[in-house]
Swiss-Prot record:
It comes from Helicobacter pylori (strain G27). Residues 1-156 form the Obg domain. It is found in: Cytoplasm. Residues 157-360 form the OBG-type G domain. Mg(2+) binds at residues 170, 190. It holds the Pfam family GTP1_OBG. NCBIfam families: Obg_CgtA (TIGR02729), PRK12297.1 (NF008955), PRK12299.1 (NF008956). Disulfide bonds: none annotated. The gene is obg. PANTHER family: DEVELOPMENTALLY REGULATED GTP-BINDING PROTEIN-RELATED, MITOCHONDRIAL RIBOSOME-ASSOCIATED GTPASE 2. This is GTPase Obg. GTP binds at residues 163-170, 188-192, 210-213, 279-282, 341-343. Keywords: Cytoplasm, GTP-binding, Hydrolase, Magnesium, Metal-binding, Nucleotide-binding.
Amino acid sequence: MFVDSVEIIIASGKGGPGMVSFRREKFVIKGGPDGGDGGDGGDVYFEVDNNTDTLASFRGTKHHKAKNGAPGGTRNCAGKKGEDKIIVVPPGTQVFADDKLWLDLITPKERVLALKGGKGGLGNAHFKSATKQQPTYAQKGLEGVEKCVRLELKLIADIGLVGFPNAGKSTLISTISNAKPKIANYEFTTLVPNLGVVSVDEKSGFLMADIPGIIEGASEGKGLGISFLKHIERTKVLAFVLDASRLDLGIKEQYQRLRLELEKFSPALANKPFGVLLNKCDVVENIDEMAKDFCAFLNLEVQKLEAFDLEPYLGFLHPHLTSDFENDPNEKSALFVLPLSAVSALNTHALKFVLLKALP
């Protein structure tokens, strides 16, 4: 089950009480105080685990508390520190307290202290003085800290797929990555985001994210899109997947409406580097004319695709992709316009190299 938002209560442990005791030895009638200090309460940590990509483990477990410190002992023995509470979360988890961002947990294996445990109380040995040789007082341990927090998951991926329902995003990610999403010939097959690892060669690869299809009004809460648009906010490059075979809505209109929804949701998201994939090109007779017209619409110089062993359709590759220059993360024009077919794997192998090269 994919869960990307939960509310939990976290609490550090209470400090253990100090001990009231006196030294008892043979031939010593009134030994001095030897009460030990209480142990500190356990701390609460968040730890990032790369082996999970959901917050589902928190369903049904609302309270997460560290252990209390142990009481001090006799003979100046300090109590044991309370056991820490380690809360494991996937990369990309944001922790909100009082509706304000408190922690942003991104790096795998990162461990961040959230709450410090209460200090253990001092034993009566600390309170001996010239006028008080037999103190019968020891401190209580300090209380721990309790906090109600909201965990929000924003998946971390290099490439984010954006498109209308049934555009072929799930088929594409299943073709070029290790992801195995549900695929069917109807809209809204994808109900949760999918992450896939794309292996380009033995040394190179990247992460791709596919979110449920966006519909008009997604930025205002319609459909499933707004719930998951946040999962592509961290991506480095967006790939608009357009259905070239669709008769009721042309590729220019698809692109314009998708971009409008992104701009409404987040201007920063809409300004990310991007490319365009003209999917289902194998069932379109005039794909070259369609690509030529679309490139003109984006003010791009159409070209015959030859690099990366692409099929020789008309399309566009930014000069950065076919040179040794590094990509500009602030590039505003499209990085690529590629006809492909996810079903027949047409240009999908070459797409891996194009996307890898497109990453800043």
